[in-house]
């Protein structure tokens, strides 16, 4: 009994000590050791972990994964311009997925497609901040880049095995993991075939539950087709803001299937494992202007003069066939704004 009280007092000390004065490794060892000792005496391990380790280290718990869908919608509307379809679909799809986790039979899988500089990566970053307390720094966010992560085509089979192991280990650690595959069109063909089963069944032979996870594929595939189709609709007199997902979804699916990269002729598409093919529309001058104003505000100039705005706008290149669409969207504006701001 005396041993019990010694350990109990030790537990209280861990709960209330000011860990700022301890080294991280020392703190981790003390917490882990104390938790193990209490668990051995019959205390619930998860309760102990929640009140010790998880007070200072990120855990797969609601405190660290708030899934703040209100924040998601508000930040998307404030920071993303000209993407009413993406904002609507992403917000609703994530909200439904997280509200129905116990009923879900597969992970949520979305494909973000469109030309560069129009918000695809930014939307994924907003998602990270809304879902996880630590945002982009969360250990439950896993990002892969086609130009960096999988550079050698002849190692595709090795990458495929490594990727499957990474995904399995991540979901085993936290079922609410987020996987973002950027520049999918730059990845070797077939590399995503290894994780096809995780996108479909939801549960592997090792009883790893994938149904709560979210997978995002980001690509430029279909960008030209999206621009041409939107231009056609607008020339017919249809409003850009009245376009909906169904106007573009089949087009984006086919373009991804026929494009170069990891999803070329992929079983992921053939087996209908991607839930939503989300088109990101090309930006017009009015959208680019909002990006410029936002960038001026970010650098501490919330009220730029008309001359400054025009100076940046004049540097924007527009498509030859569809002259109202900016070629690079908002991608190159940061340095352009910086150059104009420096001319005082």
Task: Give, region by region, the residue ranges found by the protein language model.
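Conserved catalytic/switch belt of AAA+ P-loop NTPases
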Residues: 168-169, 190-216, 220-224, 231-240
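Short glycine-rich substrate-engagement loop in P-loop NTPases that contacts/grips substrate
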Residues: 138-174
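Conserved AAA+ ATPase "SRH/arginine-finger" region at the nucleotide-binding site
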Residues: 219-221, 235-268, 275-288
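C-terminal alpha-helical "lid" subdomain
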Residues: 2, 23-41, 126-129, 268-271, ...
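Pre-Walker A (pre-P-loop) alpha-helix and adjacent loop at the N terminus of AAA/AAA+ ATPase modules
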Residues: 68-108
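Extended, charged/polar low-complexity intrinsically disordered regions
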Residues: 2-5, 11, 15-70
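Walker B catalytic acidic pair
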Residues: 182-183
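Walker A/P-loop
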Residues: 106-139
